[in-house]
């Protein structure tokens, strides 16, 4: 069962509602501590004909794992330090994919998380693990002014 819709930003490539080139995904916090999103990639995001570009899959997982930190109660800005992916199946365009992110371990300085992209039949197509670190205090303080650009946007 879905618990809560997370906020979207204005210009983020993945969730920015005002980004004309963005994917405009919505993220939802689940009862099992995960964050999920769905996405059907149009042909413009293909690498090979009919196949989602691997860089788009990477961006989807990066964002979803990072958002799992918000689900876990981390109220600070974080950035990706390391992200590893395993591409297990061809990911087609034009079908609804499910993207899931979870926190594995959290500390004062950062967190590790895992993510996956599943095909419509539930088959695991891509899996990822990532290390995310807290922004240094000076950078974090300057980012606080950008919080008004994040809001919960209706579906």
Residue ranges, per PLM feature:
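Non-catalytic linker/capping segments at the edges of enzyme domains
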Residues: 1-44, 148-155
């Amino acid at each position: 069962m879905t618990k809560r819709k997370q906020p979207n930003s204005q210009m983020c490539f993945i969730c920015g509602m005002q980004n004309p080139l963005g994917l405009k995904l919505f993220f939802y916090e689940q009862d099992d501590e995960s964050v999920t999103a769905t996405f059907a990639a149009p042909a413009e995001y293909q690498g090979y004909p009919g196949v989602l570009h691997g860089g788009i899959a990477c961006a989807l997982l990066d964002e979803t794992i990072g958002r799992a930190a918000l689900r876990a109660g981390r109220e600070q800005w974080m950035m990706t330090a390391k992200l590893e992916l395993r591409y297990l199946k061809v990911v087609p365009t034009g079908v609804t994919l499910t993207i899931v992110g979870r926190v594995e371990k959290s500390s004062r300085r950062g967190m590790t998380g895992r993510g996956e992209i599943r095909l419509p039949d539930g088959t695991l197509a891509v899996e990822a693990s990532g290390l995310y670190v807290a922004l240094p205090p000076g950078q974090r303080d300057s980012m606080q002014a950008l919080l008004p650009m994040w809001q919960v946007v209706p579906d």
